[in-house]
């Protein structure tokens, strides 16, 4: 490992230990001294706050007007039921919000498995208990709204956004699919150097996203936010007016820059979609007609485009640009 004293080491992914379907440990080394904490803390904050997910935001329960009520024949009060719904882990394909229903009667527990939903919705933990019916003639009927979002949005922040009918209960929305993330920095050694860092990330999710995929998305978000500093100019220099390009440079990049999974990337190439500009002009319906490209791949593509401020179904006049040769 001979080189300039000012040359930075480039870390490599040493190991990914899948402890369970929702729990993984990732080891990265070697890092220059101090970079373990620099990268570990940045990734941890992004993983906790910036990975999109789904959460229960509104609930309507027959016979209930406000959250401070109780219902005969149910052990829990309404606030307890709302707290249990808040912990519901839901995965939705191709939709930003859905309405779920639950109708249960008779003695016994009411679980997430009793929720009625279509094929686009997956309940991660169907055994999750929502409440208990304590009488044979007791029943509960509810409508549950699940929305896509990011971070944590308390119910109080949404109270005045629109007029809501009496009986529609708001729930604090925790959209993040990452339940726990910690990092540890240990000493690493490369040849004669013993002053290096090893970064160990340990992540747990609610099951709606693979831990490895969550880390990859967080790293992508961090890299994109730092791009502005790479292109930083000295503001004291007089700015030379440049001709505004006809298209956003991002649209001229190959789809490989999106770092999609191999399956999604191959499906796009098979349809001669080589550039991001080609991709954003396609609609969801058109992409779903692509052989081997399912709803999971479509959701991945939409998420990656959204992180760049793009979406499917965009109209680009005069595409491709003059002199732009499609591979």
From Swiss-Prot:
GO terms for biological process: DNA-templated transcription. Residues 247-327 are annotated as: Alpha C-terminal domain (alpha-CTD). Keywords: DNA-directed RNA polymerase, Nucleotidyltransferase, Transcription, Transferase. GO terms for molecular function: DNA binding; DNA-directed RNA polymerase activity; protein dimerization activity. One of its GO terms (cellular component) is cytoplasm. It holds the Pfam family RNA_pol_L. Coiled coil: none annotated. It comes from the Bacteria. It catalyses: RNA(n) + a ribonucleoside 5'-triphosphate = RNA(n+1) + diphosphate. Its EC number is 2.7.7.6. Residues 1-233 are annotated as: Alpha N-terminal domain (alpha-NTD). The N-terminal domain is essential for RNAP assembly and basal transcription, whereas the C-terminal domain is involved in interaction with transcriptional regulators and with upstream promoter elements. Belongs to the RNA polymerase alpha chain family. Homodimer. The RNAP catalytic core consists of 2 alpha, 1 beta, 1 beta' and 1 omega subunit. When a sigma factor is associated with the core the holoenzyme is formed, which can initiate transcription. DNA-dependent RNA polymerase catalyzes the transcription of DNA into RNA using the four ribonucleoside triphosphates as substrates. HAMAP family: RNApol_bact_RpoA. This is DNA-directed RNA polymerase subunit alpha. It comes from Baumannia cicadellinicola subsp. Homalodisca coagulata. The lineage of its organism: Bacteria, Pseudomonadati, Pseudomonadota, Gammaproteobacteria, Candidatus Palibaumannia.
């Amino acid at each position: 490992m001979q080189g300039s004293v000012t040359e930075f080491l480039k870390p490599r992914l040493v190991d990914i230990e899948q402890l369970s379907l929702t729990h993984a440990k990732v080891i990265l080394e070697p890092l220059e001294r101090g970079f373990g904490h620099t990268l570990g803390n940045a990734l941890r904050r992004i993983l906790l706050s910036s990975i999109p997910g789904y959460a229960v935001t509104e609930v309507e329960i027959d016979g209930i007007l406000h959250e401070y009520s109780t219902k005969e024949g149910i052990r829990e009060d309404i606030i307890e039921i709302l707290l249990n719904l808040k912990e519901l882990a839901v995965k939705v394909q191709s939709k930003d919000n859905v309405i779920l229903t639950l109708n249960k009667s008779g003695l016994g527990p009411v679980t997430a498995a009793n929720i009625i939903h279509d094929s686009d919705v997956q309940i991660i933990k169907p055994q999750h208990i929502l409440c208990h019916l304590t009488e044979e003639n007791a029943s509960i009927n509810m409508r549950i709204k699940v929305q896509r979002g990011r971070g944590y949005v308390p119910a109080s922040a949404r109270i005045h956004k629109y007029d809501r009918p009496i009986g529609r209960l708001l729930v604090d929305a925790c959209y993040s699919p990452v339940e726990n993330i910690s990092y540890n920095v240990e000493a690493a050694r490369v040849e004669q150097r013993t002053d290096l860092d090893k970064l160990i990330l340990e992540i747990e999710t609610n099951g709606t996203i693979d831990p490895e995929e969550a880390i990859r998305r967080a790293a992508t978000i961090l890299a994109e936010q730092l791009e502005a500093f790479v292109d930083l100019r000295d503001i004291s220099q007089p700015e030379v007016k440049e001709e505004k390009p006809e298209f956003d440079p991002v649209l001229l990049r190959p789809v490989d820059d999106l770092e999609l999974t191999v399956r999604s990337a191959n499906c796009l190439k098979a349809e001669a979609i080589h550039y991001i500009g080609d991709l954003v002009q396609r609609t969801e319906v058109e992409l779903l007609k692509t052989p081997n490209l399912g709803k999971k791949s479509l959701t991945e593509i939409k998420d990656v485009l959204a992180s760049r401020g793009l979406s499917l179904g965009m109209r680009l006049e005069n595409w491709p640009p003059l002199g732009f040769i499609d591979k």
